Curated annotation (Swiss-Prot):
InterPro entries: Globin, Globin-like_sf, Globin/Proto, Hemoglobin_b, Hemoglobin_oxygen_transport. Pfam families: Globin. Residues 2-142 form the Globin domain. PROSITE patterns: GLOBIN. The keyword Transport applies. GO terms for biological process: hydrogen peroxide catabolic process. GO terms for cellular component: blood microparticle; haptoglobin-hemoglobin complex; hemoglobin complex. The lineage of its organism: Eukaryota, Metazoa, Chordata, Craniata, Vertebrata. Involved in oxygen transport from the lung to the various peripheral tissues. It comes from Squalus acanthias. This is Hemoglobin subunit beta.
């Protein structure tokens, strides 16, 4: 993936201006509300699917860690996601379409958090970043 300097700057702006943990936890809650079948992958949550629940907070932390890796290696994400992709495929049996659903929910929450700063240009750059992450997570499925 080729990134322009402007795209990287826009992704950086999103990353540095948001409370990652809060936004990802809200995105997970949105995922569970809008796509309730995704809860089947989270049996250990024991029915606790709200952003404030400790189970969601813990998983949000894992998602934030993965996004941080992607952000820090924006020019070469795939090699850094090999093990995570493999885990989701071989151990967790997660349908890779769900990565896209979470990415979409995250984009909605970022738009809500950034309001007017979430311009069409920012949205396009973040969407590109999300697609790179989703592709890297889905690599083990190919």
């Amino acid at each position: 993936v080729h990134w322009t300097g402007e795209e990287k700057a826009l992704v950086n702006a999103v990353w540095t201006k948001t409370d990652h943990q809060a936004v990802v936890a809200k995105a997970l809650e949105r995922l569970f509300v809008v796509y309730p079948w995704t809860k089947t992958y989270f049996v250990k949550f024991n029915g606790k699917f709200h952003a404030s629940d400790s189970t969601v907070q813990t998983h949000a932390g894992k998602v934030v860690s993965a996004l941080t890796v992607a952000y820090n290696h924006i020019d070469d994400v795939k090699p850094h996601f090999v093990e995570l992709s493999k885990k989701h495929y071989e151990e967790l049996h997660v349908d890779p379409e769900n990565f896209k659903l979470l990415a979409n929910c995250l984009e909605v929450e970022l738009g809500h958090a950034l309001h007017k700063e979430f311009t069409p240009e920012v949205q396009a750059a973040w969407s590109k970043f999300s697609n790179v992450v989703v592709d890297a997570l889905s690599k083990g499925y190919h």
